[in-house]
Structures are given as structure tokens and as C-alpha cells.
């Protein structure tokens, strides 16, 4: 299932992203920034973005939430 809104993304969600070659990778949601919403430290992002972390600790930034699939 794909996300319909950035508000549906939860911290700790396990998601699958697909790269340009069709290879699917499983990630964990680390941070979800929503455009126009201020976080606890006073940061307000200008666009939506989600920061993911894989099993090896590598971080990936996704700007289009519809590219991520939720693992049930």
C-alpha cells in the first residue's frame, strides 16, 4: 500500500522504496518533515521530505511520499 498523504507516515514505519533499476530496498522511517509545520526545535521545512535509514545505517532522503510502500 502506498501513502496517500505525508500525514500518514509514522516514525518507525517500515517502508519499501524502489530505485531506477527496479531494485526494492526496505527502510525504517527516521524523520518525517511536513511542509509548513514547525518541529520542536523551531525548524519549518519548505517542502515535504522523509529521512529513511536502512539496515546498515545509511540514510536516504525521499521528497515524494508516494514513492514509498508500507510494509504491513
Place the predicted regions along the sequence by residue.
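Intrinsic disorder/low-complexity segments
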Residues: 14, 34-39, 56, 67
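Mixed-charge, Lys/Arg-rich low-complexity intrinsically disordered regions
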Residues: 1-14
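Intrinsically disordered, low-complexity, charged/polar segments
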Residues: 45-72
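Short beta-strand-centered aromatic/proline hotspots
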Residues: 22-39
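Short histidine-centered beta-strand/loop micro-motifs
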Residues: 41-43
